[in-house]
Structure formats: C-alpha cells, structure tokens
Amino acid sequence: SCPDGIATLILREVPFRGEGYILVRGVFGTLEGLLAECAGFCRAAGAERLFAAGEADFSGYPAAIRIRERSAPRESLLPAPEAVRLVPVTEETAADWAREYNARFRAVPAAESCSPAEERALAAGGEALWIWDGAERIGLGRVRGGELLAVAALQPGAGERCVRALAAQCTGPEVRLTCAEENRRAMRLYDRLGFSRGAEERVWFSI
C-alpha cells in the first residue's frame, strides 16, 4: 500500500520471463501515482515488462492480455481417442513434466510457470498428467474437477487429442478453462471443438 492506493504485486514470473503483474485493489489518490510506486518496486525486483489490472479505470492504458472463460459440454468432447491414455505424474517424472510445461507455456500470455515448490508437489496432487497415444508421449495436462488448468501438445497436430483425453478425466457435465485471446492457436482449437466464448475473466493492461 501507498498513499495513492493498495495493490498486490505478483512477482513469481520475474525469474521465469521478466514479467511483473500489479493487481490494483483500490485507488485513494491517482492511479498513475499508485502504478508508478508499484512499478518502481517491480523493476527493482528485476521485472522488465509490467502489466496491471483490477479495481481501477485503465482507459488510458493499452489492453495487452485478455483472459477469456471458455466452456463446452463434456459429452461433446467424448469419447477420447481409443489409443490415447493418461498417465499420472510420479516423483520420478515430476521434474520432466515441469520442464516440459515451462518450455511450452513460456510464450503463452499471462501463463503461470511451474515453480520448484510446485514441482515437488505435482505427484502428490494427482492433477498433473502425461498424455500418451500408443507408445508416443503426445502431451501434458492438469485437471481439477471440471476445469482444465493446463493442456499442451508435445507433438505437432496433437492438440485436439490432448483436449479430448483430458476432458474424459474431468468431472461434471461441463469442461471449463481460461485462455488468453492473444493465444490465437489455442483459441482456434477451442472454437473448432465447440467451446463457447464466455466472459472476460481479466484484462491485463501494459504499463
């Protein structure tokens, strides 16, 4: 907090890709003053690119990342391809999963990296999965209830098979996820699979 307001600084992506995020909770003075104070702290921590969102009027800043809610009836994504199977991450494969995940999501707007602490918890959580098609490892994913937290193809053209396989792991009548509109390849895949375009969950503005 500072005289101009309150914000949460998200610095976990600074070591991974040099990005800092400022989530504004309230403005008491000016938004410019609050962002300047926060930006100085973020840059001192090593952030090279800064984004802000939250409870404020950001009309003077360019929208950089639009996070969109998407959903589809689970039954419409089934059955999963017959030869495709899901294999839970183990303690022996957790480091490999985290490495592949971080490599695939490094260029995805506003995606969270898998930290060393999260890597150590992957096997125990049961959410992280490898996706195999026969003898070939084609992707990875993370599922929690009816939500796809992550999906990434490791082979060209495997995206649809990965989504369908993970949908089979979901519970409930609907498969939900969020996707940055700027991640155009993923957005096109979800369009093709019949995912609806819901509300904007959050818009990050470049500062």
List the model feature ranges, each with a label:
Residues A80-E112:
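Short amphipathic alpha-helix that is part of the acyltransferase structural core
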Residues G26-A36, A44, A150-R164, E181-R188:
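Conserved glycine-rich acetyl-CoA-binding loop
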Residues A165-Q169, R176-I207:
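Hydrophilic extracytoplasmic domains
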